[in-house]
A protein has these predicted regions:
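A short, hydrophobic/aromatic-rich structural module that often spans a beta strand
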Residues: 20-26, 37, 170-177, 228-241, ...
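General structural feature for long, well-ordered alpha-helical segments within catalytic domains
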Residues: 59-66, 99, 103, 132-135, ...
Length: 380
């Protein structure tokens, strides 16, 4: 990042943004986490649900058991939990359309009134040479058969390849078909080689669209979630940034913003406990007030413990990929007694080695010890 320019040269009004404006030209790129600290808000936790497999078939009992465990953990701490279905944790890129639809139907049958978020992406565009919004239509139509859900428009190669103005137009074209609230999705190339995060102008344009209620951003190398949060809070935008940073869980909790992460699938009780511990006693809904009358400072050690565990779940392979986190998640959930099988989707090549169960047991030593010390249930 270049040196901080003089504050009077920084853009602070959205009307001054241009499609080519970079974040470092704005005031929001220079807002610190400390400036955004929030001990009052109780944002939701959006937890991506693993679709476990037994052999080559989905383990439906395991799938539902994971969601029951998540909801029970969140209810204990008074946290709003929104399951995220058919995202990367749910093998969206390997799911056939019928299996995609079955995931949603089985969820809705078991949980008839629970809100959920569902990922949609482009289908059938492998031979395309340009962006086609209609590629999103098959999964979008399947998702919108259900009520009380939000649609996460996951980025795709040709949508991401567009310049900011045409990329905005692409999202707006997809939004014409939205009948449910929409969530936009951005990645850094550190996750997917062709991905680029949103420029400030593009974020402002999308955040101003009435059908988009929020967005998820996942980055490893630059703090775009802080940029988003600073801009949206400063401008009072009716748009909720969601952190997709599995390596930075504490940041979202500390600044009072929602999480939308695959990591939550294996550590929901820890995240919910941390969210409650971070709240000041003055928050009426705080489940476990402290004797000191303020937030529980032991949360800092809980942050460390849960992040050290998720750093193991999301560890890089020698190709620089974390995609096998899904397999690690299955082993972690089996170690917790939530599921009984750790197979992956038969067409997914992202797998850990045969010692993964032991690796996860080792990674869970500290968080389990912290859970016992703090009286956090459902993580024995």
């Amino acid at each position: 990042m270049p040196p901080h320019p003089p504050s009077n040269e920084l853009i602070s009004q959205p009307e001054d943004l241009r499609p080519e404006t970079t974040w470092t030209e704005t005031k929001w790129a220079w807002t610190s986490e400390e400036d955004l600290i929030d001990h009052q808000s109780r944002p939701r936790l959006c937890a991506a649900v693993l679709l476990p497999f037994r052999g080559e078939e989905p383990d439906w009992d395991g799938f539902l058991a994971i969601i029951h465990w998540m909801l029970r953990s969140a209810q204990y701490y008074g946290v709003e939990l929104v399951p995220v279905l058919n995202a990367d944790t749910g093998y969206i890129f390997q799911l056939s359309n019928p299996l995609y639809a079955e995931v949603l139907q089985r969820f809705r049958t078991e949980f008839p009134t629970t809100k959920f978020i569902v990922g949609v992406t482009a289908r059938g565009g492998e031979a395309d040479s340009h962006f086609r919004a209609d590629r999103y239509r098959p999964l979008l139509d399947l998702a919108q058969e259900h009520d009380n859900c939000e649609i996460m428009i996951m980025t795709s190669r040709w949508l991401n390849a567009l310049d900011p103005q045409r990329r905005r137009d692409g999202y707006f074209e997809i939004a014409e078909w939205l009948e449910r609230p929409g969530i936009v999705h951005a990645l850094e190339p550190s996750f997917v080689s062709w991905a680029t995060p949103f420029e400030p102008w593009l974020l402002w344009q999308l955040a101003s669209h009435p059908k988009f209620v929020g967005g998820k951003v996942s980055t490893l190398d630059e703090p775009h979630f802080l940029y988003w949060s600073a801009m949206c809070r400063d401008l009072s935008l009716d748009f909720s940034p969601h952190s997709g940073d599995d390596f930075g869980i504490a940041t979202a909790i500390k600044i009072g913003m929602p999480l939308l992460i695959g990591a939550a699938c294996s550590c929901v009780p820890l995240v919910c406990a941390a969210k409650d511990m971070w709240l000041d006693n003055s928050v009426v809904q705080k489940k476990f007030p402290t004797s000191a009358g303020r937030f529980d400072t032991r949360v800092y050690k809980l942050f460390e413990a849960l992040q050290s565990f998720e750093d193991q779940v999301f560890r890089f392979d020698f190709q620089g990929s974390v995609a096998a986190y899904k397999h690690s998640t299955a082993h972690a959930l089996k170690n917790l007694g939530i599921i009984h099988h750790t197979d992956t989707h038969p067409e997914c090549s992202d797998r850990r080695d045969v010692a993964e169960s032991v690796t996860m047991q080792s990674g869970m030593i500290r968080p389990r010890r912290m859970a016992a010390r703090l009286g956090i249930p459902f993580f024995e």
